[in-house]
């Protein structure tokens, strides 16, 4: 019981990674994810209003007709109520649709990114290419990222989430992720960054991220891609610009 309460408490104060008994989104680190959270909360508010009204109507109808089973014979055609129950749902849908479309187009826009990272999905690992940077050998910086097996996990590392190499990016920098697949369809998804994009073989999809705080953010392949689908984690380390430049010099 104590472990359960501790886990629930940690979910409230810190939720950058998937946790047991988690019932809400991970903490957002990008404007896109902030918009997604706000849209979700607004829609849930409207849903509770609708649930309350419908429940009240059902309760009233059951209460009324249980006392007088013949009352329905005295009900006549009511144009006013028909207009109300047609217009009210339409207004609610419009209130939900407009912010949703705006957010959808904002998340899809990638304008003048400061750097580009290419993520290629394989069965069953990820390969990353920093196409804007070249090492001392004149080659593009690239590496592969594999899940750490259970028997090699160290204390504090997360099962099926930690990887042998991390994607290191600077904070407060407009980053473009170009995503594709090498064999079957994969999906590049990082909840805290508001990123979820298909990795289709033969096609390049792109998504942008502006990470606003330092930290380690985890994701996974979100498209069933074979027997080891669960062994395709994604680990993003967001660091300050000086630390990022230091990391680049080490590559």
Curated annotation (Swiss-Prot):
GO terms for cellular component: mitochondrial inner membrane. It is found in: Mitochondrion inner membrane. Its cofactor is Cu cation. Cu cation A1 binds at residues 186, 221, 225, 232. Cu cation A2 binds at residues 221, 223, 225, 229. Mg(2+) binds at residue 223. It comes from the Eukaryota. It catalyses: 4 Fe(II)-[cytochrome c] + O2 + 8 H(+)(in) = 4 Fe(III)-[cytochrome c] + 2 H2O + 4 H(+)(out). It is a multi-pass membrane protein. Pfam families: COX2 (PF00116), COX2_TM (PF02790). The chain crosses the membrane at residues 42-62, 83-103. Disulfide bonds: none annotated. One of its GO terms (biological process) is ATP synthesis coupled electron transport. Keywords: Copper, Electron transport, Magnesium, Membrane, Metal-binding, Mitochondrion, Mitochondrion inner membrane, Respiratory chain, Translocase, Transmembrane, Transmembrane helix, Transport. Binds a dinuclear copper A center per subunit. Its EC number is 7.1.1.9. GO terms for molecular function: copper ion binding; cytochrome-c oxidase activity. Signal peptide: none annotated. Component of the cytochrome c oxidase, the last enzyme in the mitochondrial electron transport chain which drives oxidative phosphorylation. The respiratory chain contains 3 multisubunit complexes succinate dehydrogenase (complex II, CII), ubiquinol-cytochrome c oxidoreductase (cytochrome b-c1 complex, complex III, CIII) and cytochrome c oxidase (complex IV, CIV), that cooperate to transfer electrons derived from NADH and succinate to molecular oxygen, creating an electrochemical gradient over the inner membrane that drives transmembrane transport and the ATP synthase. Component of the cytochrome c oxidase (complex IV, CIV), a multisubunit enzyme composed of a catalytic core of 3 subunits and several supernumerary subunits. The complex exists as a monomer or a dimer and forms supercomplexes (SCs) in the inner mitochondrial membrane with ubiquinol-cytochrome c oxidoreductase (cytochrome b-c1 complex, complex III, CIII). NCBIfam families: CoxB. Belongs to the cytochrome c oxidase subunit 2 family. This is Cytochrome c oxidase subunit 2. It comes from Candida glabrata (strain ATCC 2001 / BCRC 20586 / JCM 3761 / NBRC 0622 / NRRL Y-65 / CBS 138) (Yeast).
């Amino acid at each position: 019981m104590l472990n359960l309460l501790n886990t629930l408490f940690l979910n409230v104060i810190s939720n950058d990674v998937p946790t047991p008994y988690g019932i809400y989104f991970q903490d957002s680190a990008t404007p896109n994810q902030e918009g997604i959270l706000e849209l979700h909360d607004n829609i849930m508010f409207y849903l509770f209003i609708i649930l309350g009204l419908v429940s009240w109507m059902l309760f009233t109808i059951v209460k009324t007709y249980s006392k007088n089973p013949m009352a329905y014979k005295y009900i006549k055609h009511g144009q006013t109520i028909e207009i109300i129950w047609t217009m009210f749902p339409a207004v609610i849908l419009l209130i939900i649709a407009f912010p949703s479309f705006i957010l959808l187009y904002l998340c899809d826009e990638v304008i003048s990114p400061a750097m580009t990272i290419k993520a290629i999905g394989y069965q069953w690992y990820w390969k990353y290419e920093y196409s804007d940077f070249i090492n001392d050998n004149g080659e593009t910086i690239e590496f592969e990222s594999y899940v750490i097996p259970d028997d090699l996990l160290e204390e504090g590392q997360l099962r099926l989430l930690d990887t042998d190499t991390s994607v290191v990016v600077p904070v407060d920098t407009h980053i473009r992720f170009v995503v594709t697949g090498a064999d079957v369809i994969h999906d590049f998804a990082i909840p805290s960054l508001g990123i979820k994009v298909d990795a289709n073989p033969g096609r390049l999809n792109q998504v942008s991220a502006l990470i606003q705080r330092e930290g380690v953010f985890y994701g996974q392949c979100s498209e069933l891609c074979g027997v080891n689908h669960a062994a395709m984690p994604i680990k993003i380390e967001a660091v300050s610009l000086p630390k990022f430049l230091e990391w680049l010099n080490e590559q």
